[in-house]
């Protein structure tokens, strides 16, 4: 619908930037064309990571039933590769193995492969958590769970207050609780890369 349009995403990202969002280097999301176009325009220079879970579902949905287990094993191997080159090599082996048996699935995977392995450019420590949208999906599930308890909101402002309170609660958890990941090593890695290339 309209809530998924390029213009809607563009306005949202512009508002986030206007409110001070800076230093975006990697964005993990589903593959909605409008979303991806808006991301690339508003966060130029940031890498885009296509959610591997969503791509895997798309590929498996186009895979013949008798090949699904084999395809799933190949996808796990590709997505858990140590490097982009290794992932590409594994895809080449898969394409040779299933040539003529799962063409639609292979075409979908080939079209999305580079975007789904963008995370392999990062240090291994960060890949598992950044390769999917699981963190955001869990947050959305929690919002929906709490919303179902209330069931009927008297007005949209009350719904916004609930969502705002839940997001604030999650923000505080990220600040004070167990860290989802520590970015200090990432910034050291980035600085070392900059020094070696400059």
Identify the function of each model-found stretch.
Residues 1-20:
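Active-site beta-loop-alpha junctions of metal-dependent nucleic acid enzymes
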Residues 1-5, 27, 48-51, 63-67, ...:
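A generic short alpha-helical patch detector that favors 3-5-residue windows
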Residues 7, 33-37, 107:
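Alpha-helical elements of the RecA-like P-loop NTPase motor core of helicases
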Residues 22-24:
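A general structural motif
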Residues 77-198:
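Acidic/histidine-rich catalytic cores and adjacent linkers
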């Amino acid at each position: 619908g309209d809530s998924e349009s390029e213009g809607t995403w563009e306005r949202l990202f512009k508002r986030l930037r206007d409110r001070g969002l800076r230093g975006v280097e990697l964005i993990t999301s589903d593959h909605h064309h409008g979303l991806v176009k808006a991301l690339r325009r508003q966060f130029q220079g940031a890498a885009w990571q296509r959610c591997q879970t969503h791509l895997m579902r798309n590929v498996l949905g186009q895979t013949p039933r008798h090949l699904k287990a084999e395809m799933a094993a190949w996808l796990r191997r590709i997505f858990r590769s140590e490097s982009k080159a290794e992932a590409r090599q594994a895809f080449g082996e898969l394409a040779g193995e299933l040539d003529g048996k799962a063409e639609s699935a292979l075409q979908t995977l080939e079209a999305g492969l580079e975007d789904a392995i963008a995370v392999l450019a990062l240090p291994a420590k960060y890949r598992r958590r950044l390769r999917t949208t699981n963190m955001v999906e869990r947050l959305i599930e929690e919002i929906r769970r709490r919303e179902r308890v209330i069931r009927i909101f008297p007005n949209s402002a009350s719904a916004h207050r609930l969502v705002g309170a839940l997001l604030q609660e999650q923000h505080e958890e990220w600040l004070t609780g167990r860290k989802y990941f520590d970015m200090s090593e990432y910034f050291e890695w980035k600085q070392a890369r900059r020094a070696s290339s400059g």
